[in-house]
Amino acid sequence: VIAFLTSITEKAGIKARYLHQGMTSSDVLDTSLNIQLVQSGKILLNDIDQILKILKRQAKKYKYTPCIGRSHGIHAEPITFGLKLASFYEEFKRNRKRLVDAIEEISTCAISGAVGTFANINPNVEKHVAKKLSLKIEPISTQVIPRDRHAFYFSVLGIIAGSVERVAIEIRHLQRTEVNELQEYFSKDQKGSSAMPHKKNPILSENLTGLARMVRS
């Protein structure tokens, strides 16, 4: 923030003295971070809506398609593939609600100056910023927005990543040669291996599994 202000000051001249008046770096950084998290969360909500739409459609399509149910990876009792997809659908419905709650939790701003006392800035400035950015004001004045808000937001991302991984691992298991109950989409000219052209590897599911672990970490 200091480097940014210095750069602006060199170009704006004497009026630059008002640019950061009464604020701290935390006012700028915490508020801008929360804006980014809110906007990112809305992108994820749209993605989850697409996932829900597809899972619902496919669950209905395959509601009478029999497959074997497994526990501990071992054949148990018959189920339908639609039931399996319906389970994924309900899980992502819960994830959507969690994400909505997380976005609401992180939608706050703080423009209250050093240690949050408004000593050198009018509280109306904070109200104006909150209204402009569609954020809420922190209920208790503070310099640093409490990190439990961020912890909740990122824990929800970890849960969503876990759900994505659960679907991906299921696809990987069902695509194994000795199982061969399910396959990722494989285009006509797609190659599975440079050395073994007969292979159809679940690359997308493998990538999703790896990315989910990175999110949780």
Question: Where are the regions that the model predicts?
Answer:
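A helix-coil-helix interface module used to build multimeric assemblies
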Residues: 1-112, 118, 123-128, 137, ...
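Generic secretory/membrane-interface signal
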Residues: 21-24, 130, 164, 172
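Conserved short-loop catalytic and cofactor-binding motifs
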Residues: 80, 113, 141, 155, ...
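Active-site-adjacent "gating/activation" loops or surface patches in catalytic cores
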Residues: 126-143, 147
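A conserved active-site cap/scaffold subdomain adjacent to cofactor or substrate pockets
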Residues: 146-217
